Amino acid sequence: MKKIAILTSGGDAPGMNAAIRAVVRTAIDKGLEVMGVQRGYSGLLNGELFAMNRTSVSDIIQRGGTILRTARCPEFKDEEVRKRAVKILNAYGVDALVVIGGDGSFMGAKLLSKLGIKTIGLPGTIDNDLAYTDFTIGFDTALNTIVDAINKIRDTSTSHERVSIIEVMGRDCGDLALHAGISSGAEAIIVPEMGEFDRDALCRTILEGKNHGKTHSIVILAEGIGGAEELSKYVQELTGIEARATILGHIQRGGAPSASDRVLASRLGARAVEVLLQGETSRVIGIRDNQIIDQDIDEALAMESKFDLDLYNVAEVLSR
């Protein structure tokens, strides 16, 4: 193996730059050439490849987003489109591709490997929705961003003695909502893993809190459930307490990565190069019990969600 390429795909996540830096510098240290692919699979199809060196990744570990840019590429599901991508990689002399992204990005990597391109996946998504790894790159930073926002919202919620319903990202995974809720002392956490929730029961919980002396309530709502505005109106009508909805949106994806995400991304990026040099392909890198692991991509994508029910139950007790 002489040359590898690296791309970021799908939604951006804080820490992607730290992972890029780790891959590039580890690869160069091992005597490999590195090419960056701009704008994910879409950029690959357009031949947007360029040579990278140590300087290319200087002063980026502290930056959010991705210096390689990112994009979604639904047309990559077409095999003829993927064959065109393989031809482009071959034309540049690329022996292997490192893909940083979520499950959709991993699926693209898996399909490329079936066409003869060695691929390795790094988990880059704030959603923490990849079951094979305890944490994904970007989750910790997004969590801290959410908690910081909740702290500010709680200030005004306390002043106005109102209910604040805060919708957070995570797609169909409730990890961000759960961890943010327990970290911020939320009165209620609503996640898709717990099934359809009872709006009337939520209202009773809020009223019970008021009877026990609580002057305000914070409700964390996962976007997999959604409907923050509608829920706030319902709560206000049934409880008689002023309620406001806040959808945090894309602020959760931005900002300088946390120290934890920088360390995680660096460890995962370095391991990706090592696995490639061992001749492996169609693998994904992750962390389990603080140990860096690699796993077959098919096995990883087939694993079921790992929602922490014990932590949810702790949050339920502490919120009363």
From Swiss-Prot:
Active site, renumbered: D127 (proton acceptor)
Residues reported in the UniProt entry to bind Mg(2+): D103
Pfam families assigned to the protein according to its UniProt record, in alphabetical order: PFK
Keywords: Allosteric enzyme, ATP-binding, Cytoplasm, Glycolysis, Kinase, Magnesium, Metal-binding, Nucleotide-binding, Transferase
Residues that coordinate or bind substrate: T125, I126, D127, R162, M169, G170, R171, E223, R244, H250, I251, Q252, R253
Annotated TM spans: none
SUPFAM superfamilies reported for this sequence: Phosphofructokinase
EC number annotated for this UniProt entry: 2.7.1.11
UniProt-annotated binding residues for ADP: R21, A22, V23, V24, R25, R154, G185, A186, E187, K214, T215, H216
Function text: Catalyzes the phosphorylation of D-fructose 6-phosphate to fructose 1,6-bisphosphate by ATP, the first committing step of glycolysis.
Name assigned to this protein: ATP-dependent 6-phosphofructokinase
Species in which this protein is naturally found: Clostridium botulinum (strain Alaska E43 / Type E3)
